[in-house]
Amino acid sequence: MDAARASLLLAGGLAVSTSTSAVATAAQTVSIPHLSPHTRRRRQRRFLRLASAAASSPPPLPAASAQPHCSRWVVVMERPPAPAGGGEVSRAEAVDHYVATLARVLGSQEEAQMRIYDASWDGSYEFSCEIDDEASRDLAKMPGVLAVKPDTDKVDMSEKDNHGSGLSAANLGNFSDAVSNHSSSSGENEFWLVRMEKPGVEVVTKAQMVDHYTQTLMKVLGNEKDAQVSIYHISWERDYGFCCHIDEECAKELADVSGVLSVQPDTNFGSDNKNYKGDDSFKSSEATQAEVKTKRLFVTGLSFYTSEKTLRAAFEPFGELVEVKIIMDKISKRSKGYAFIEYTTEEAGGAALKAMNGQIINGWMIVVDVAKHRSRDRQPPYSASGRSNQVLRSRYHTG
């Protein structure tokens, strides 16, 4: 009976508190019919080893365990397969390849999209994602994956004042040299602190805010790369804004961009202690946006997987829609990441502009602006490198 009880306890994964001698006695008295003496002795010896191991091992962990800790990883990839028509791999094709690779580990394409927060496809092929340690080990075994390593560029946000992020020491030194050289030859300021309106949603990620700031600055500078290298500090949790290196003329233009509260000289350059709070003398973007009247909106920051049906459902509550048009790449037949929305009335367009700017659709924070000309349907903004100005993820250090 004791042996049977010990056997049941072992099968249930519980520790057995019994002496080896007692177990030996029980094992010898167990009747196992239809077995040869040799097989019976072998099973008795195995029973003794299991019981002894169970008696000496610590109790098992509770059934309810904490969720696995997720860390940030940089995944270095081989060059994605060349397009059917030849030529360079486009951004959309590279992102699709990264998502498909990660989805093989996570089991869901949607989950893979949400986990990727940074990507590179121009010259080097890699992406950054937030997954647990076990998933990172599985990912390292996937075909086409060269390496999976911790994302050491990410700095603990608790070490930053006001939850801001600054440059690396090397880059900060380069900017300091630029300040010194510029000050000796000109009295003009080129380092600015930009206060931004709070997004229209309660929860956003750091990567989404970086995208938002980059797209805002792109409206003045004209291309993605210049916007990325100009930003040297961001704030994104309690107060919203960024610091950038631009000339005074661009700073004046930036102050008139939708969502910008103010543009001031960065009087505390070289330090992470920035004042993004401002005061009551700054303009009210609420009042500015309330005066906007437009039927036609330009939406950027869309996920490549957002459909016109999803976009229509998001914008329809503000009024009757005339058109919802996502601009597609003619070769890949995939979304370019931006769209045009048109309402029957200016009131509906103005309400949608105010409410939808900064909202999250399919995990991506969108930017909504007034559509200036219909020609933009045919000619999207391009950077000097020839790539669309739609931002995927910033590739500069943000902490």
From Swiss-Prot:
Q: Which PROSITE patterns match?
A: RRM
**MF terms in GO:** RNA binding
Q: What is its main location?
A: plastid
The organism's superkingdom is given as: Eukaryota
Gene Ontology biological process terms, A to Z: cytidine to uridine editing; mitochondrial mRNA modification; mRNA processing
Q: Where is this region: Disordered?
A: 377-399
Its biological function?
Involved in C-to-U editing of chloroplastic RNA. Functions as major chloroplastic editing factor. Controls a majority of the chloroplastic editing sites.
What is this protein called in UniProt? Organelle RRM domain-containing protein 1, chloroplastic
Q: Which gene encodes it?
A: ORRM1
